[in-house]
A protein has these predicted regions:
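Tandem amphipathic alpha-helical repeat scaffolds
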Residues: 7-15, 45-59, 88-103, 129-143, ...
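Alpha-solenoid helical-repeat scaffolds
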Residues: 19-25, 33-129
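Amphipathic alpha-helical segments of tetratricopeptide repeats
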Residues: 1, 27-37, 68-79, 111-123, ...
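TPR/TPR-like (Sel1-like) alpha-helical repeat modules
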Residues: 1, 7-14, 20-35, 269-285
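Alpha-solenoid helical repeat architecture
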Residues: 2, 39-46, 78-89, 121-132, ...
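C-terminal non-catalytic interaction modules
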Residues: 273-364
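C-terminal structural cap/anchor segments
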Residues: 223-297
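Helix-turn-helix repeat elements of alpha-solenoid scaffolds
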Residues: 17-27, 57-74, 101-116, 142-155, ...
Length: 364
């Protein structure tokens, strides 16, 4: 609008021969045009980057380099232009860049800086934008094992979304994961009930509904006494082929592991051995050792159950070196081949050993 008005007035004063006024609006038109070009360039960089990040969980070195370059360019553009939109694009490009490199500490810091910037420009306030930032901060806290601040951001994010909306369910999904990773299983159960008990839950996609079924399985595994009154068909879960069978990363391995955990609890040695071997073969075919470090290590730990004939002490001793490696690795950025850890593998392993020990000499 500024450019259009400046051009019209420039033309008007040129026709009248008023040089001073002509120059005034000519300068304004030049400044406006420069700003538009800067904003257009920043929009292009952000949208091009977003299109690549949104459709993939695995980021190439080329994309990493591009994201870094765009972040630096947007910084230079915003440095000399007093434009809310341009500064906002710079922050958004930066958040995408840190997402690509998987640095959640830097992402969290940039989110905090963005919130300060938005408070200074409150006239442009959007509830959805504030909810988006709070959600992103909660996810960062999940990967940084910061339950206290994660919970605070989760509660904050929920204020900005209508109950039953897609974004509301997204917040609850991440909130559930945060609680499970912090060992707050009772709270996780409350979040689960809040989501699945909502009247809009039935309208979620099949994929999203199944994700909540998987969450329920893990919740039932860690809280069998609390959930035994609920209808959860363990045998059906063990035997059914899920929607995610075509997804060779992400949630499908999490399903296979959950099924195996229930078999271990039931003491079904034959099926345990068969399924651990199937999981090993699956891992060698579809899970990259470099990109799925924690899952690959955990599968090796599970194999010690067979190798040590389900003897708790022997299993614990044989798996100890792998547990050390697992503890030293970090749960973080999910690549396209990484498994979603609904419960940290270290916690699952502790439960397995504890329940095996309670059976005294195992199943022999």
């Amino acid at each position: 609008i500024t450019l259009l008005c400046a051009r019209m007035l420039r033309h008007h004063y040129s026709m009248m021969g008023l040089k001073q006024e002509f120059q005034q609006f000519n300068d304004l038109a030049d400044v406006s045009l420069k700003l538009i070009r800067s904003e257009t360039k920043a929009e292009h960089m952000y949208e091009q980057l977003l299109s690549q990040v949104a459709r993939s969980k695995s980021y190439s070195q080329e994309l990493t380099a591009t994201a870094k370059e765009y972040f630096n360019q947007s910084k230079e553009l915003s440095k000399y232009q007093q434009s809310f939109h341009l500064h906002l694009l710079h922050y958004r490009i930066g958040l995408l860049y840190y997402q690509v490199i998987g640095n959640y500490r830097l992402t969290l810091n940039l989110c905090n800086r963005l919130q300060v910037f938005l408070k200074k420009n409150s006239r442009y306030r959007l509830a959805s934008r504030e909810g988006e930032i709070a959600l992103l901060k909660m996810v960062c806290c999940l990967y940084l094992n910061d339950y206290k601040n994660g919970k605070q951001n989760a509660d904050e994010a929920l204020k900005f979304y209508t109950q039953g909306s897609n974004n509301w369910f997204v917040v609850l999904q991440n909130y559930f994961m945060l609680a499970m990773h912090a060992g707050k299983h009772k709270q996780a159960a409350e979040i689960f009930e809040q989501a699945t008990g909502h009247q809009r839950f039935q309208y979620l996609s099949d994929e999203k509904s199944e994700e909540w079924k998987i969450y329920e399985a893990y919740l039932h595994y860690v809280m069998p006494a609390k959930t035994k009154g609920k209808e959860f068909k363990i045998l059906k879960f063990i035997n059914e082929v899920p929607i995610y069978s075509k997804d060779k990363g992400g949630l499908y391995p999490a399903i296979l592991i959950a099924q195996l955990l229930f078999m271990i609890d039931r003491g079904d040695e034959d099926r345990i051995e068969k399924n651990i071997e199937s999981l090993r073969i699956f891992s060698s075919r579809y899970l990259s050792g470099k990109k799925s470090v924690r899952t690959s290590i955990f599968i090796k730990m599970l194999r010690q159950l067979i190798n040590c004939h389900f003897k708790p002490e022997k299993v614990k001793a044989k798996a100890a070196p792998y547990l050390k490696k697992l503890t030293e690795s970090k749960y973080g950025h999910l690549t396209e081949n990484e498994t979603m850890e609904i419960i940290p593998y270290e916690d699952i392993w502790s439960i397995i050993l504890s329940r095996m020990t309670s059976k005294k000499q195992g199943w022999n």
